[in-house]
């Protein structure tokens, strides 16, 4: 890390420790005398620790490699993957596996990283899932990069930005669609920040499989294409090309469609509403904090419930349209009931 210390000294806030799992030979010797075959797993974590042991709590480390102890790395992401529907499914499996390994903050590359550009629909569905994930990011190898052999006959156009995808497919209106999802992400930041605080306080992954919270429900034991995002949201990404609806399992309790506010009873399978933008459901008795049009809003789901808003240091209890707020906040908050 000493080679990079000058960057911290001039105010760099964080580092992305790409790679970290590469060794050139099983027979190579590490400095402690172990061979490549013996030390290749530990090397991954040593590579990351060289930075994480030196940076301050205010700095961030974004890594892809890890071994035993990876749960202590600030942020991990899924690494380079191709732009296919199967890879998107694998990315979600990786996220849920990471959560069960104690990894709190996790990310992936919207639309994939390598190979031919994703279809418009794959990019859309990948973006939707990223909105409801701990870290939202897109990036890719540069045009004609190291994975160009995956693109025989291609012109090398590989940039995964929304505007390049729109340009490549001749669909300028796609930019407005992407602006909607990126704006929604910005509006959800208060809820995401709250979820991150809970993750740190309780060692509870932000994005996690349903079995993490509903361990007595046999229907969720092997469920690998839905997840919880924080304590309030259940997300069921659309995984197939041009898919607009899917089967969704809702655990015990009442659940509200995040986009339409329609209420569903839990402990059953439902068909998601094809008119909704994405199958996302909010658990009754919980809250969602958002910032819309510059206004701080807290949405109260269900006929009664309670929640603590950590950023404002207030406790909320409601029954019907009667609400009790304990604590003081300098924020002007608008409460909205979803019943």
Q: How would you label these PLM feature ranges?
A:
Residues 277-339:
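Accessory, solvent-exposed terminal regions and/or long lumenal/extracellular loops of proteins
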Residues 1-277:
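Catalytic-domain carbohydrate-binding cleft regions of carbohydrate-active enzymes
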């Amino acid at each position: 890390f000493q080679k990079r210390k000058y960057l911290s000294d001039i105010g760099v806030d964080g580092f992305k420790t790409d790679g970290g799992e590469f060794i050139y030979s099983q027979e190579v010797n590490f400095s402690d005398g172990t061979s490549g075959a013996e030390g290749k797993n530990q090397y991954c974590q040593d590579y990351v620790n060289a930075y994480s042991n030196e940076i301050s709590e205010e700095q961030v480390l974004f890594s892809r490699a890890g071994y035993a102890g990876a749960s202590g790395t600030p942020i991990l992401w899924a690494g380079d993957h191709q732009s296919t529907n199967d890879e998107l499914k694998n990315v979600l499996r990786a996220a849920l596996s990471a959560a069960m390994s104690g990894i709190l903050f996790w990310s992936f590359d919207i639309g994939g990283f390598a190979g031919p550009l994703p279809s418009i629909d794959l990019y859309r569905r990948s973006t939707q899932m990223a909105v409801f994930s701990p870290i939202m990011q897109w990036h890719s190898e540069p045009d004609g990069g190291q994975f160009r052999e995956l693109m025989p006959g291609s012109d090398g156009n590989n940039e995964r930005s929304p505007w390049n995808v729109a340009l490549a497919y001749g669909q300028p209106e796609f930019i407005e669609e992407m602006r909607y999802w990126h704006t929604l992400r910005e509006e959800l930041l208060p809820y995401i920040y709250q979820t991150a605080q809970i993750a740190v306080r309780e060692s509870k992954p932000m994005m996690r499989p349903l079995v993490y919270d509903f361990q007595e429900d046999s229907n969720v034991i092997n469920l690998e294409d839905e997840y919880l995002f924080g304590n309030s949201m259940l997300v069921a990404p659309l995984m197939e090309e041009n898919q607009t609806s899917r089967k969704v399992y809702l655990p015990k309790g009442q659940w509200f469609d995040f986009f339409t506010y329609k209420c569903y009873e839990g402990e059953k399978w439902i068909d998601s509403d094809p008119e909704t933008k994405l199958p996302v459901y909010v658990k009754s008795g919980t809250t969602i904090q958002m910032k819309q049009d510059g206004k701080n809003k807290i949405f109260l789901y269900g006929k009664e419930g309670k929640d603590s808003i950590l950023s404002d240091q207030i406790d909320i209890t409601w029954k019907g349209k009667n609400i009790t707020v304990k604590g003081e906040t300098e924020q002007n908050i608008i409460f909205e009931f979803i019943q």
